Amino acid sequence: MVNIYNDINALEATFRKTPEFEALQAAVEVVKSDEEALNVFKNFRKIQIELQKKQLAGEELLEDELVYAQKASQLVQQNEKISAMLEAEMKLSKVIEEVNRILIKPIQGLYEDIQ
């Protein structure tokens, strides 16, 4: 019997060695070492999470919440360190998407003859 978890753990170790992961790791450290950037990012994440919770609960987002979120987003975009971190995260996300596409390929193959 195949133990897929051994392979996944090996993949996780390899994933940590990719240039994309290492770039994100370095970018996160840069943000963490800058108190202002860190506070701006923490506030932005807090707002994002609060708005997502409200949306998932089916609650309507208030205009002032959206304006506040937009202002927080602008602060994030204006901070070069945070922008670099988010750009590194997006590059890493592309790697994750590609891995996911490869993992899903066998499932897609199962359904090809059904169409």
UniProtKB/Swiss-Prot annotation:
Q: Which residues cross the membrane?
A: none
> What Gene3D superfamilies does the database record attribute to this sequence?
YheA/YmcA-like
Give the matching InterPro entries. Answer: Com_YlbF, YheA/YmcA-like_dom_sf
Per the record, the similarity remark reads: Belongs to the UPF0342 family.
Name of protein: UPF0342 protein Bsph_0375
Organism the protein comes from: Lysinibacillus sphaericus (strain C3-41)
